[in-house]
Amino acid sequence: MSELLPAGNNAAISGHAAAVELAAVSAADTVAGTPVQGIAELGEIAGAGVGIWELRGGTVTDTEVEELFVVLSGGATIEFLTESGVVDHTVEVVAGDVMRLTAGSRTRWTVADHIRKVYIAEA
């Protein structure tokens, strides 16, 4: 996969219009619906990966990496789960929100339509 904003170039792209190829989320990570997701890699900054991630139509689980993200469009309900799978707390994010995720956090994302975010994450 090529980077949309490789190092050494002064360039800009539209975060809303950038092509993100979507594929089905694995059955093991799907809780409800028929979610699809994808990533468009933008590049790397100081060893951290930067990209656009999109999720559509469903509920999925994930184990997070250290990450900071900005929601470009859409929104999600993110439930933070204990080791036993009980909801510890919930965060709602919408376009314009900035959020930090801590490595190892277990989450459940519910997306009615879509969420598209720009992320900076440990590689």
Please place each PLM-identified region on the residue numbering.
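A short, N-terminal "cap"/entry segment at the start of jelly-roll beta-barrel domains
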Residues: 1-52, 91
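Short solvent-exposed loop/turn micro-motifs enriched in small/polar/acidic residues
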Residues: 33-35, 61-63, 92, 100-102
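Conserved short histidine dyad/triad with adjacent acidic residue
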Residues: 44-64, 103
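Short, conserved beta-strand element in jelly-roll/cupin
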Residues: 55, 64-78, 82
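Short, surface-exposed beta-strand-loop junctions and turns on beta-sheet-rich folds
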Residues: 68, 84-86, 116
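Short acidic-glycine-tyrosine-enriched beta hairpin
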Residues: 83-103
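A short hydrophobic beta-strand segment most commonly corresponding to one strand
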Residues: 100, 113-123
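Short, exposed beta-strand-loop hairpins at the edges of beta-sheets
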Residues: 106-111
